[in-house]
Structures are given as structure tokens and as C-alpha cells.
Amino acid sequence: MISHREFRPAVVVIGGSGGIGRAIASVAARERGAVVLVARSPEGLAAAAAEVREGGGEAFTLELDLVAGDAPTRLEDFLSARGLVCDVLVNSAGYGLRGAATALPIDGQLGIIDLNIHSLTELTLHFLPGMVARRRGGVLNLSSVAGFVPGPYMALYFASKGFVRFFSEALHQELRRTGVTVTCLAPGPVSTEFLARSGAYQTVLFNILPKVDPEYVAERAWRGFKSGRRLVVPGISAKLAALAAALLPSAAMLPLVGRLQRGGNDPCPCGSGMKFKKCCGTRQIQLRRGLRGIIP
């Protein structure tokens, strides 16, 4: 039996098989400690583990259905059996769907709540008390600039990211002077498979905002977390988007975001009967071209 004092601290990356989570795992590996990658994809986990080892870290992988009711317990048992304790929890798993809420499958939309909200909350609340008792460690939660505004045509995704932001910022305040940090990461569009899977790549909004690499986001996320930051918004364009969302009233933002969330092949909301990209979307495309070279 391993005594509590003999447990080694580990960075646990939920959704570590790809995207931002995988990039954060690679950055964390530089500290040459244990990195535990948790996801459903065995191929992605194997590739991410190889990157962690190349970076100097010790990699462990766990295939886990994150929305299963016993996921936190199974993860803790996995750690305990290897003499590890969750010192840093990175919640980067999530997904979204694009389309009118009334047209998308109900099960798919409820799945967004299950993964983006319920699973993240359950894992966070499961591991935080141990961190507080040890007076060290913390949680890095992945939100998005989408969490600053309501998002017509990706209503549940935007709402879920708003939950993550408010939940994380509240915990950050609650845990001051405990030695534990909770940081919210809110990037703009990132060049990962998420854009294709969710359909977000089709929208004018995600095409106007410049995309950044997950490695860029990971570097700034880890640096911000290590320095105890409450909120990290990587990149000037993402910061400008977050600022605009904070300053403009919802009455102005909602119609704007709704139009920008349209895909090029969607019917134009003006009622012309034309495709959006051939009608009102043309003006947004011209705006995007005009912004190139101005917004990095």
C-alpha cells in the first residue's frame, strides 16, 4: 500500500488526445513530471503520449467515457494504482453543433451539456478538495471567446462556454489564499478538428476571426495558469472580440452574432431566397478581406 505522502503529483489532461489538450500536455511535459492523458481515442492517446515522452515527461493514458457516471472514480482509481495524485487538472474536452436549435437532434444538444458542463463540473469538484487539502495545484478549464456572448445557431455551445467561464472565475475567487489556482482559458478560433466536426468552419464569424495554432494557445495557457491568472485570452483578435462582447449591449450583439453565425450555404435571413454567401454574406466576406493584415 502506498502512503499518501508517497503519491507523485501528476498533470491530468482531459481530452488529451488532440487539439488544445494535446498541445498543453506537450508543454506540461517540459517539467519532466507525470502527465496523464484521458480521452476515448486510443490512436490519439498513443500519439499524444509519444509527444509527452519526447518532451521529457512520463506519460500515462486512460481510455475513458467522460460522461459515464463513474468517470471521476475510475480516473482516481487509475491514478492511485500508479502512485499518482491529480495535482493539475486540465479540462479541455468538449464539442459543439452548428444549426438552429429546433433543427438539431435533441440528444446531440444534450450531449453538449453532458460533456462541456456536467463532466467538467464533476471532475473539477471531485479533485479540487484534495488540492485544497494539499495547498497546491489547480484547474485549467477550457472556455472560449464564445463564452462572452449568446450564440444563435450554436446556442448550446456558446452557453456551455459561458458556464465554464463564470464557474471558473467564481472558483478562482473562492480559492484565493488556498494555494490552489483555477484559470479559465478563452481562445478564439483554433486550428483543430473541432472547427470541422462542429461545422463552425462554415460560418462567417469563424472565418472573420484569424485562427491560431493550438501550440500558441497552449504556451500562453500554461504560462497564465502558472502565474495564477484568472482568465487567459490568447491573441489580439480574441482579446478584441472579448472586449467588444463586454462593451456592446446584448440587443446589439445578438443580431450581429446571429448573422455572422450563418453558413455560406444557409438560406439568407433577409428573406431573399438566395444563399447567404450570395446575398448578405457578401458584405461580411468583404469585411473579412478588409481586416486581413489589420487584425493579427
Where are these regions (language model features)?
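Conserved glycine-rich cofactor-binding loop
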Residues: 17-18
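Conserved glycine-rich Rossmann-like NAD(P)H-binding loop of the short-chain dehydrogenase/reductase
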Residues: 31-48
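Conserved NAD(P)H cofactor-binding loop of Rossmann-fold oxidoreductase domains
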Residues: 92-97
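Substrate-binding pocket helix/loop in short-chain dehydrogenase/reductase
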Residues: 100-113
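Active-site helix of classical SDR
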Residues: 124, 160
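Residue(s) in the substrate-gating loop at a strand-loop-helix junction
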Residues: 144
